[in-house]
Design a protein with these regions (language model features):
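Catalytic palm active-site di-aspartate
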Residues: 469, 541-556
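C-terminal, non-catalytic extensions of nucleic-acid polymerases
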Residues: 564-807
Length: 807
């Protein structure tokens, strides 16, 4: 049994309406059965597969004090285009011909998993598709999602985030070999720190009476006794849980933390964050959800783009969540602290879980409320992509109405968002005008919907979500209680997530409801609206600097100064826009450094820097280079040319004199994305060149006799005497660098400094650039006469070009 405090006064819940009273759009959005407080749903797979399929529901009691378990019947199903493909199995399934003319015209339902998989295998044989999934079937892969779709139930109804029992944990590992490796027997887990949202904390650690195997058994016992609904951690999938599972295997300890006493199931998975895809080992725990705050921070940064990195400490400081007098220890010092400052390290570990709790509480709200709508569990809602979320809503409603499903179109989208740069240089003041919900507004006002959406769900759900969000935002303004306001904010954010996902469905190649022509129509219309906005800003005396998909950065007219005037000017642009399109004020900045398209820096009135794009500052660059560029940008924004020159000279002198804070200042750290054997095979086949990271990993393995595996991180620096050395032949592990006898390649790092400095070439004349970024100071440097350049850029779009408009 797990205990928790009763729910606090909650905000109005649109999902709580009885199905008989709910509108069609609400039933489609929230499901037909408002069963409350479902925490998790798990298929029962431990019996014979020929028996009737069932699921186990984990449900909080009315007072939230305990978990109630009960099993329910479940009927595995799929949609099929041709029912005759199942000829010969007629006594093993039930089917229904669906309404409409869509491709998947029949619903097929089974009583057992044996019958279900036999039917799929027969279709594979009859369609010659054993090598790939047959096009004749539309299958919902997750049994849990199938159950939630057919029952019309969703998780977490009538609950708030804190009604869930959320447990945070973090491990610390002792290693003498750089980054911990669970395959090395000596790389032991030394500390496991816990906290939860009930005010409880606990530290487990090695001591004279506790070896690692005992520590692992204690960890299992603590999790089972606390019985949380959610396990939260930072990078918990790729490190903490995976490492514990590996160490449990080493010591023959069952990591049996499932609510049914099972060991977690692991499998390879991936998540996409804008242009970046992250592979990770997913971990499923029966009856519980795993939430990784590392992924939450990455999701946040897709839109903010101003986090320097995704570490727990950085994120906690960014959001103002770090505990007062927080203990900080660098990762490389963990083992030393265990030997020399054990109490300090224990304080550090406890601060880690406290930060994780605060971070998860801050970032989990929208996902929590998404789970109240989607036929997905809380953990799945946190990890599934936007198109999958929308499609799950559509399939649930098509299933409820017994309507055939469309087949995804072949093809691709040809139009994208409108991005352009008109002026590079340093300008200010800056206003950001945002076309509010540009693509959703276009889709609503221009009757956009996929051709296969026979039920018109696309416009119905989009309109209902938009209305719900506006109503919730108004409730937020009216609410006096801060807790209620916070809950409402999370709820409106969940609506926003779904609203912004509709466009992605149109252009997603694997979506059953895709429509590339409609996706292109939305993008093309968006481009035209932004061009109208640009023209209107210019007509009213503003200077447009850049346009980026759904907003415009501009210098307001001379007579418009101060926040109130800037807001009035920006919002007033709406009157020139097409019906249903609103222009909003989305920020003001003291100055802007415009570099190239989709790459710029903004200086807030509080003195903070915000960056867009990776051309200026890339996380793959050496830390000293990132620091140099960041400081140089600030000096440019301040028009401090002398300070910029001094920064260059100072950084150069530090490189020449090996005046580094540590090897981390100039070392690169890269992750092994392949095994060493796969790397060698690719090199031998001529599929890739040799790389410093892998060559050093091989050296490390040979030197220590300890295995290096995929996912390990290698930190290294460049050696040698000339700037043009071959990296894999002239590199050493960062741990080998000796500050008393430095052997880094000074010429190479001076070249890297000059490469960073070249980013600023567009802001000066050629002669001035050579003066500013020159080490020659014999006669002293003077910034007199040096002007920061502004350059106009020819637009990708010309006002007089003849272009077909689709409306």
């Amino acid at each position: 049994m797990s205990t928790s405090s009763p729910s606090q006064t909650a905000a109005p819940d649109p999902a709580a309406a009885a199905p008989a009273e709910a509108s069609d759009a609400d039933v489609a959005l929230f499901g037909k059965d408002p069963m409350p407080r479902i925490v998790d749903v798990q298929p029962v797979m431990d019996g014979p597969s020929g028996e009737p399929a069932t699921v186990r529901l984990y449900q909080r009691s009315e007072d939230f004090s305990e978990i109630i378990e009960h099993e329910e019947p479940f009927y595995p199903f799929f949609f099929v285009s041709d029912i005759s493909l199942l000829k010969g199995l007629r006594d093993r399934f039930r089917f229904q011909e669906l309404s409409g003319d869509n491709f998947y015209s029949h619903l097929v339902v089974f009583q057992s998993w044996d019958d279900y998989w036999d039917a799929i295998r027969q279709i594979e044989r009859r369609t010659d598709s054993e090598e790939s999934w047959p096009d004749e079937i539309y299958r919902v892969g997750s049994p849990t999602q199938q159950y939630l779709m057919q029952s019309g139930r969703t998780c977490l109804l009538d609950m708030t985030l804190d009604d869930l029992h959320r447990l945070q944990f973090d491990i610390e590992v002792y290693t003498e070999g750089g980054f911990p490796n669970a395959d090395r027997p000596e790389d032991k887990i030394i500390i496991v720190a816990f906290s939860d949202n009930r005010g409880w904390t606990k530290l487990l650690h090695l001591d004279d009476e506790t070896d690692e195997a005992t520590l692992l058994r204690q960890t299992v016992q603590v999790i089972r006794e606390r019985d949380p609904d959610v396990i939260e951690g930072h990078n918990v999938f790729s490190f903490d849980l995976t490492y514990i599972l590996d160490r449990c295997n080493l010591h023959n300890v069952d990591f049996a933390i499932g609510r049914d006493g099972s060991v977690p199931r692991t499998y390879d998975s991936s998540m996409r964050f804008a242009e970046r895809t992250v592979d990770y080992p997913a971990v499923d725990v029966v009856g519980r959800h795993v939430i990784d705050t590392y992924f939450q921070v990455m999701s946040f940064d897709v839109f903010s783009r101003d986090l320097p990195d995704y570490s727990l400490k950085t994120a906690a400081r960014y959001f103002g969540l770090a505990p007062e007098e927080r203990t900080y220890i660098e990762g490389v010092d963990i083992s030393r602290a265990w030997r020399e400052e054990r109490d300090t390290l224990l304080d550090y570990a406890l601060d880690d879980v406290i930060e994780t709790k605060r971070l998860a509480g801050h970032l989990s709200g929208s996902t929590f409320y998404l789970a109240q709508m989607l036929p997905m569990t809380y953990g799945s809602s946190a990890r599934r992509g936007p198109a999958a979320k929308i499609e799950s809503l559509f399939v649930r409603e098509y299933l409820r109405q017994r309507h055939g499903l469309p087949r995804s179109e072949w093809g691709s989208q040809s139009m994208g968002g409108y991005t352009d740069i008109f002026i590079s240089g340093v300008m200010g003041p800056i206003v950001y005008a945002d076309v509010e919900s540009l693509y959703p507004s276009i889709m609503l006002n221009y009757d956009v919907k996929p051709s296969g959406d026979s039920l018109d769900l696309f416009p119905q759900l989009l309109e209902r979500l938009t209305d719900l969000r506006l109503e919730t935002k108004q409730d937020m303004k009216d609410a006096e209680d801060e807790e209620v306001r916070s809950e409402l904010d999370a709820r409106q954010s969940s609506y926003k997530v779904l609203i912004n996902s509709f466009y992605g469905v149109l252009g997603f190649s694997l979506s059953a409801f895709n429509d590339f022509e409609e996706a292109d129509r939305v993008a093309r219309t968006g481009q035209e609206i932004l061009r109208e906005l640009i023209a209107e800003i210019r007509e009213r005396g503003g200077t447009v600097i850049e346009v980026d998909t759904d907003g415009v950065l501009f210098v307001p007219p001379d007579g418009v100064r101060g926040e109130e005037a800037e807001v009035d000017f920006t919002v007033g642009l709406t009157e020139a826009m097409p019906e249903g399109i609103r222009v909003g004020f989305d920020g003001r900045y003291e100055k802007m450094l415009s570099y190239k398209k989709k790459n710029y820096a903004l200086l807030t009135y509080d003195g903070d820097l915000k960056f867009k794009g990776s051309s200026l500052i890339s996380r793959s660059n050496e830390p000293f280079g990132r620091d140099f560029v960041r400081r140089a940008i600030r000096r440019l924004l301040d028009h401090d040319v002398e300070g910029l020159h001094a920064l260059y000279v100072d950084t150069r002198n530090k490189i020449v004199n090996s005046d580094w804070e540590s090897v981390d200042s100039f070392a690169r750290t890269e992750t092994l994305k392949d095994t060493l054997s796969d790397y060698e095979a690719d090199v031998e086949a001529g599929n890739r060149p040799r790389a410093a990271t892998y060559e050093l990993a091989k050296q490390k393995q040979e030197r220590t006799g300890k295995p290096v595996k995929k996912g390990d991180r290698i930190s290294y620096y460049i050696t040698g005497d000339s700037a043009g050395v071959t990296a894999f032949k002239n590199s050493r592990l960062a741990a080998d660098w000796d500050p008393d006898n430095p052997d880094e390649n000074t010429a190479y790092y001076l070249k890297r400094l000059d490469e960073f400095a070249e980013k600023f070439e567009p802001f000066f004349t050629e002669a001035d650039f050579r003066l500013v970024f020159s080490p020659e100071d014999m006669f002293g440097f003077s910034a007199d006469g040096i002007e920061i350049q502004e350059r106009e850029h020819e637009s990708d779009y010309h006002q007089d070009q003849d272009e077909e408009v689709p409306f």
